[in-house]
């Protein structure tokens, strides 16, 4: 009996497409998805009892591995006396305090429930603070399913081949300007044309939602320069790369200070969580201090705060975790490149710390959305199915990132490289 198929088929009766997030349907790779039952460390198990070495990690959050003992214990302990109050708690102060005291350029922070909430709220705050309406986002970058972001978006929008999104009125995107990632001249032209109306730029400082694409430090400096010149805010969307490429996130890669930063994924320890923070003078424009209104019934709830606090403290107190992830990440990257070269396989590997993407292409580098769109989707599909059959859970999309955790070992990397070497292309 195929329990995976049985559960997925029944799910389709009650949930659109059988899923609660489109990429989980495995539609782009043409098979039914495994239905996951349990996970521990770097391993997960499906309903048929198949085990996989997991390189998806819930799309990034599980940097400590699945069911980390300290995170689980924190959740259990908190749940014995509190779940949700819709009121202030000491736990939300504890998490806010460690974040503000250990992260760069975060004087104050506001907790929300998801990455989408964090980014849409940060953009609203930027508009309220500057009294301007237009926002620049970059083609291929995904900032959640907020209407104003669903234009030239990455992630599932790109995976599912959706040119836009039905249900998004033209009015909702008229103030969204599209920049080209790593193209200084094009962004400069946007400011020359619309500069007095631009409230800010939102950018993934390490793009992960069109696959991993690195930001040129020179390009980032230009964004800061333009924002300063036109009195706009620079917003780093670190929902994915925050706490992943380094404890302090992608800010460690650039000599550039953002005005606002958004977080989610890792900071919630695997539970629904998000946050946005920045300079005090900006954050104090939020209600109840200022006129920018944002609220949430479940924001800062004790269970999530306890999981987030356990995760953040563990990462902060153990910098060697990032050394380990860099070591095995470098080994994986170099091994894949060496095998591809030996096979004569057109491949670009983009990696930053514990996030990585394989682009099947004859290009020498992949540095923007247009480069990503030229990649060989059919070859990726064959690669994905090959690796799944070898016992590896990797993203079912060429436009997503693979992730590493502190629980991945050199043995896991060796097994991945062995499986990749047997891929015939």
Curated annotation (Swiss-Prot):
Alphabetical GO biological process terms: protoporphyrinogen IX biosynthetic process
InterPro entries the record matches: 4pyrrol_synth_GluAld_NH2Trfase, Aminotrans_3, Aminotrans_3_PPA_site, PyrdxlP-dep_Trfase, PyrdxlP-dep_Trfase_major, PyrdxlP-dep_Trfase_small
Modified sites of kind N6-(pyridoxal phosphate)lysine: 265
Localization: Cytoplasm
Cofactor(s) listed in the protein's UniProt record: pyridoxal 5'-phosphate
Pathway(s) where this gene product acts: Porphyrin-containing compound metabolism; protoporphyrin-IX biosynthesis; 5-aminolevulinate from L-glutamyl-tRNA(Glu): step 2/2
Enzyme class: isomerase
PROSITE patterns for this protein: AA_TRANSFER_CLASS_3 (PS00600)
Transmembrane segments: none
MF terms in GO: glutamate-1-semialdehyde 2,1-aminomutase activity; pyridoxal phosphate binding; transaminase activity
GO CC term, one of those recorded: cytoplasm
Acyltransferase found in the keyword field: no
EC number: 5.4.3.8
Recorded family membership: Belongs to the class-III pyridoxal-phosphate-dependent aminotransferase family. HemL subfamily.
Subunit note: Homodimer.
Name assigned to this protein: Glutamate-1-semialdehyde 2,1-aminomutase
């Amino acid at each position: 009996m195929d329990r995976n198929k049985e559960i997925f088929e029944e799910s389709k009766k009650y949930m659109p497409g059988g899923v609660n997030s489109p990429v989980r349907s495995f539609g782009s790779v043409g098979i039914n998805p495994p239905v996951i039952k349990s996970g521990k460390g770097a391993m997960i198990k499906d309903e048929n009892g198949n085990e996989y070495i997991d390189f998806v990690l819930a799309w990034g959050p599980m940097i400590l591995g699945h069911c980390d003992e300290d995170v689980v214990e924190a959740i259990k302990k908190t749940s014995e006396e509190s779940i949700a109050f819709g009121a202030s708690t000491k736990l939300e102060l504890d998490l806010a305090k460690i974040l503000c005291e250990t992260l760069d350029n975060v004087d104050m922070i506001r907790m929300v429930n998801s990455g989408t909430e964090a980014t849409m709220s940060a953009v609203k705050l930027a508009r309220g603070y500057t009294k301007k309406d237009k926002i620049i986002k970059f083609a291929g970058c995904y900032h959640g399913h907020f209407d104003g972001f669903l234009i030239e978006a990455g992630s599932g929008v790109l995976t599912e081949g959706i040119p836009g999104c039905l249900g998004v009125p033209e009015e909702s995107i008229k103030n969204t300007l599209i920049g080209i990632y790593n193209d200084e001249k094009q962004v400069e032209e946007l400011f020359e044309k619309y500069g007095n109306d631009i409230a800010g730029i939102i950018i993934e400082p390490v793009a992960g939602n069109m696959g991993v694409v690195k930001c040129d430090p020179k390009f980032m400096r230009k964004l800061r320069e333009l924002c300063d010149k036109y009195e706009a805010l620079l917003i780093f969307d670190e929902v994915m790369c925050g706490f992943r490429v380094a404890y302090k996130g992608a800010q460690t890669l650039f000599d550039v200070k953002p005005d606002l930063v958004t977080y989610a994924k890792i900071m919630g320890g695997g539970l629904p969580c998000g946050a946005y923070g920045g300079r005090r003078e900006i954050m104090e424009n939020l209600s109840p201090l200022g006129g920018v209104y944002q609220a949430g019934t479940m924001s800062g709830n004790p269970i999530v705060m306890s999981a987030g606090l356990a995760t953040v403290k563990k990462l902060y107190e153990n910098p060697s975790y990032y050394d380990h992830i860099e070591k095995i990440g470098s080994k994986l990257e170099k091994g894949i490149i060496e095998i591809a070269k030996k096979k004569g396989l057109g491949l670009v590997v983009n990696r930053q710390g514990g996030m990585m993407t394989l682009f099947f292409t004859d290009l020498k580098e992949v540095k923007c959305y247009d480069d990503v769109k030229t990649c060989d989707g059919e070859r990726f599909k064959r690669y994905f199915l090959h690796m799944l059959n070898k016992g590896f859970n990797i993203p079912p999309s060429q436009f997503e990132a693979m992730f590493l955790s502190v629980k991945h070992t050199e043995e896991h990397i060796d097994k991945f490289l062995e499986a990749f070497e047997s891929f015939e292309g």
